[in-house]
A protein has these predicted regions:
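Lipid interaction determinants
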Residues: 16-63, 76-142
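Short, conserved beta-turn/loop elements at beta-strand boundaries and strand-helix junctions
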Residues: 71-75
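Sec-dependent N-terminal signal peptides
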Residues: 4-14
Length: 142
């Protein structure tokens, strides 16, 4: 009986301590020029993308993405695209991450994102068919 209790406690502790990065995370901050920026990073199974935009206007600033893996608290990303530094494409970067239920932190550069989505399927999940568009106020359907 003691073995089963010990096994249960061990498994429970492991499941509590290993939070998933899967989902969406958001961070708001000031650029070096004093402009308010928002970055959103989305992690799915094995792929991530981060986009940065101006908080006030929504204007696009920067994006990168690629594959990722997590070994303990070390995340490794292989860059597949980078709008600001195309020479990074194909490179790998590794860094320490701290993940809990609500935050994703990179302690090396003091950055912290807040969870905005847990990655579970929502009402809009699935394939979409774009059957038309609006141009100059006129609706065109396929």
């Amino acid at each position: 009986m003691k073995k089963y209790i010990f096994l249960f406690i061990t498994l429970f502790c492991l499941s509590v301590s290993s939070q998933s990065v899967i989902g969406a995370w958001e961070r708001s901050y000031l650029s070096e020029e004093g402009e308010k920026l928002t970055s959103v990073v989305i992690f799915s199974e094995g792929y991530q993308v981060i986009s940065i935009f101006k908080s006030d206007s929504g204007e696009f600033v920067y994006s990168n993405g690629g594959t990722w893996s997590l070994n303990g608290d070390i995340m490794t990303e292989k860059v597949e695209f980078d709008t600001g530094n195309p020479e990074r494409v194909g490179s790998e970067v590794s860094f320490k991450v701290i993940v809990d239920e609500r935050t994703l932190s990179l302690p090396e550069n003091d950055r912290k994102w807040n969870r905005i989505d847990d990655g579970n399927p929502g009402e809009l999940q699935g394939a979409w068919l774009m059957a038309g568009r609006v141009r100059d106020g006129k609706k065109r359907l396929r």
